[in-house]
């Protein structure tokens, strides 16, 4: 289980993102902006205060869930098969070497962008169902940050508020406080 070189230039990262956007049907501009916000286009970025890592700063559980569920569609079946979901819903990789390899894939620009596209596509479907419309890119980013359920609650907050439609960023600020 080898991980490709993470020392790639911004044009190579942008190329990986463009390919992921085309393959997953996700907006290139959205994936590019999210990578810029999350990691400054650095595939090897690691958050100092959480398990978040890689181009899109996936936390461990979100990464494992995304690889488990979407990985087989993108040639990552061997990795997906190594991931198990426990009765508590948490994902784990019992084999330490396999876990290291799977978590290392977050630092591969091509794999990370592909999984971000699949994750975004899934979030968009869940949000469309919850909101009754196509989600905005701001709502998709809230889903990247809080998960689709959290972003769906953001839509509910906006709908049930003072009648004024708040932006997704206003909702995040209010929620975090």
Question: Where in the sequence are the language-model features?
Answer:
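Extracytoplasmic
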Residues: 26-29, 53, 135-137
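Export/targeting segments at the very N-terminus of extracytoplasmic proteins
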Residues: 1-41, 106, 110-114, 118-131
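Alpha-helical segment that forms one wall of the substrate-binding/catalytic cleft
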Residues: 64-134, 139, 145-153
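Active-site-surrounding "flap" and adjacent substrate/cofactor-binding loops of secreted or lumenal enzymes
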Residues: 52-65
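Short, solvent-exposed loop/turn and secondary-structure capping segments
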Residues: 45-47, 68-69, 154-157
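Catalytic and substrate-binding regions of cell-wall glycan-acting enzymes that process beta-1,4-linked
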Residues: 136-177
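Extracytosolic helix-loop segments that constitute the early lumenal/periplasmic catalytic or substrate-binding loops
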Residues: 41-42, 71
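Alpha-helical, low-charge segments enriched in small hydrophobic residues
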Residues: 36, 50-51
């Amino acid at each position: 289980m080898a991980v490709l070189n993470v020392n790639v230039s911004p044009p190579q990262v942008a190329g990986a993102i463009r390919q992921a956007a085309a393959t997953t049907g996700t907006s290139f501009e959205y994936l590019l902006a999210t990578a810029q916000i999350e990691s400054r286009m650095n595939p090897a970025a690691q958050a100092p205060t959480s398990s978040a890592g890689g181009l899109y700063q996936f936390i461990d559980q979100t990464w494992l869930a995304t690889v488990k569920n979407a990985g087989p569609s993108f040639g990552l079946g061997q990795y997906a098969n190594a991931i198990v979901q426990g009765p508590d819903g948490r994902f784990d990789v019992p084999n330490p070497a396999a876990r290291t390899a799977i978590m290392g894939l977050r630092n591969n620009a091509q794999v990370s962008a592909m999984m971000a596209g699949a994750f975004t596509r899934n979030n968009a479907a869940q949000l469309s169902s919850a909101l009754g419309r196509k989600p905005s890119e701001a709502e998709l980013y809230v889903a990247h940050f809080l998960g689709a359920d959290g972003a769906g609650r953001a839509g509910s907050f906006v709908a049930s508020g003072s009648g004024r439609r708040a932006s997704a960023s206003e909702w995040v600020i209010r929620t975090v406080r």
